[in-house]
Amino acid sequence: MARSIKKGPFVDNHLMKKVEAQEGNQKKTVIKTWSRRSTIFPNFIGITFAVYDGRKHVPVYVTEDMVGHKLGEFAPTRTFKGHAVDDKKTRR
């Protein structure tokens, strides 16, 4: 179920303050965040976020296509190693 339109998109206040502080700077630094639930706004374009995936911070460079999505969508939490190989096939 999608979020109600009357509520509007969600962004953590501490993350929004960091983005607004960086808008005036010429030098763009990486913003480290644990807020995977925050929605990407148009003023986030061109900023690199380090989104926490439970183990490390994954760098996510925000582009135009990402607006409206959540930051956590671009930092996968699970790594798929592949299915177990059947030893019977390799022995023949």
UniProtKB/Swiss-Prot annotation:
GO terms for cellular component: cytoplasm; small ribosomal subunit. One of its GO terms (biological process) is ribosomal small subunit assembly. The keyword rRNA-binding applies. Keywords: Ribonucleoprotein, Ribosomal protein, RNA-binding, rRNA-binding. It holds the Pfam family Ribosomal_S19. It comes from the Bacteria. The keyword RNA-binding applies. GO terms for molecular function: rRNA binding; structural constituent of ribosome. Protein S19 forms a complex with S13 that binds strongly to the 16S ribosomal RNA. Belongs to the universal ribosomal protein uS19 family. This is Small ribosomal subunit protein uS19. It comes from Staphylococcus carnosus (strain TM300).
